[in-house]
Swiss-Prot record:
Record: residues binding ATP: G35, P36, S37, G38, A39, G40, K41, S42
Organism: Escherichia coli (strain K12)
EC number, UniProt record: 7.4.2.1
Broadest EC class assigned to this enzyme: translocase
Alphabetical GO biological process terms: L-arginine import across plasma membrane
Its membrane topology: Peripheral membrane protein
Domain ABC transporter: 3-241
The name this protein goes by in its record: Arginine transport ATP-binding protein ArtP
PROSITE patterns xref list: ABC_TRANSPORTER_1, ABC_TRANSPORTER_2
GO molecular function, one term: ATPase-coupled polar amino acid-transporter activity
Database matches in Gene3D superfamilies: P-loop containing nucleotide triphosphate hydrolases
Length: 242
């Protein structure tokens, strides 16, 4: 089992953002978190690499175990983030580094790869994500879709077991959205586990092998992709019809 959450409760000050979240996602699945604004999708995603710290519950992810009755050590959090990559909605590329430099920075510093090893790994990913012509460009000179592909390549440089996406197609036009969907589907063939937050039902339908539908910090429905054609709850049925 690649990801297991049990009884996760998360607060921002006095406001509770997640209520008793329990879910499983086997290795190699693509799990999509769906729901209206304020449902808790991004909070849940951020729990998976401990950008948000729950107040209670347990998390197993990529071989790392956390019991939130105790505060995790800095080393445990670092170990987790080596195995769990994140592609942010705003891309978060380093503006002063070229595409190639963006890719090799973390593997050299964090994984201790030599520059040659990192460059060889980067070369393969630039090829795979159709970014070869842009390797010497700076993020400022790339379109939104190109920046998103660089962000995905950068996360894959760490060879994570789990890859998290926060609204990967937000603000992208339909053609670029189709490219990102295609990349996610290609990655699904490689046995990497993916978790995707989106509010775009079509993106979810095209990528998800499992789906979790949330409202107001609660899981309302979860299951495999058949939920899209046979929703089990009125709430999810209504959401899909809008």
């Amino acid at each position: 089992m690649s990801i297991q959450l049990n009884g996760i409760n998360c607060f921002y000050g006095a406001h509770q953002a997640l209520f008793d979240i329990t879910l499983d996602c086997p290795q190699g699945e693509t799990l999509v978190l769906l729901g209206p604004s304020g449902a808790g999708k991004s909070s849940l995603l951020r729990v998976l690499n401990l950008l948000e710290m729950p107040r209670s519950g347990t998390l197993n992810i990529a071989g790392n175990h956390f019991d939130f009755t105790k505060t995790p050590s800095d080393k445990a959090i670092r170990d987790l983030r080596r195995n769990v990559g994140m592609v942010f909605q705003q891309y978060n590329l380093w503006p002063h580094l070229t595409v190639q430099q963006n890719l090799i920075e973390a593997p050299c510093r964090v994984l201790g790869l030599s520059k040659d090893q990192a460059l060889a790994r980067a070369e393969k990913l630039l090829e795979r994500l159709r970014l070869k012509p842009y390797s010497d460009r700076y993020p400022l000179h790339l379109s939104g879709g190109q920046q998103q592909r660089v962000a995905i390549a950068r996360a894959l440089m760490m060879e994570p077991q789990v890859l998290l996406f926060d609204e990967p197609t937000a603000a992208l036009d339909p053609e670029i959205t189709a490219q990102i969907v295609s990349i996610i589907r290609e990655l699904a063939e490689t046995n990497i586990t993916q978790v995707i937050v989106t509010h775009e039902v079509e993106v979810a339908r095209k990528t998800a092998s499992r789906v979790v539908y949330m409202e107001n910090g609660h899981i309302v429905e979860q299951g495999d992709a058949s939920c899209f054609t046979e929703p089990q709850t009125e709430a999810f049925k209504n959401y899909l019809s809008h």
